[in-house]
């Protein structure tokens, strides 16, 4: 293999390894479901969101009727989401971030994992309600 071919292969590997962004994941209208099948109140849904967030290090703040804002700070990285909810559904949508390379609808790939974990946590708390 020539040096230029080796260099090209190395450059490609570095470029691919540097791909640390992914499209921003938003959760839209996830169903509110309890294990018993009984409808939950707004207070129960809010409490489930707060418990799920707290268990994962999110700071949850009520910003208005049926609207929570979640903030996750890990070292120098900050993610902020808004979580509108009702007795039937909730959403988790990107609001802002610091040091997460957000630009043009893409963000650091770890962000989506945090949102998936938060969504799973909320669903687990709703089921337990």
Regions found by a protein language model. Name each.
Residues 1-8:
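Bacterial N-terminal signal peptides that target proteins for export
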Residues 15-18:
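C-terminal motif of bacterial Sec signal peptides marking the signal peptidase cleavage site
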Residues 20-129:
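Ser/Thr-rich, low-complexity intrinsically disordered terminal regions
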């Amino acid at each position: 293999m020539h040096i230029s071919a080796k260099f090209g292969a190395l450059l490609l590997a570095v470029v691919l390894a540097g791909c640390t962004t992914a499209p921003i994941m938003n959760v839209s209208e996830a169903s509110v479901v309890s294990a018993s099948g009984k409808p939950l109140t707004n207070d129960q849904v809010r409490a489930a969101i707060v418990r799920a967030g707290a268990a994962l290090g999110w700071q949850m703040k009520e910003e208005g009727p049926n609207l929570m804002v979640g903030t996750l700070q890990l070292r120098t990285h900050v993610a902020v989401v808004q979580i509108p909810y009702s007795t039937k559904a909730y959403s988790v949508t990107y609001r802002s971030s610091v040091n997460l390379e957000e630009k043009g609808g893409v963000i650091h790939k770890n962000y989506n994992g945090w949102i998936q974990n938060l969504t799973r946590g909320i669903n687990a708390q709703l089921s337990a309600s």
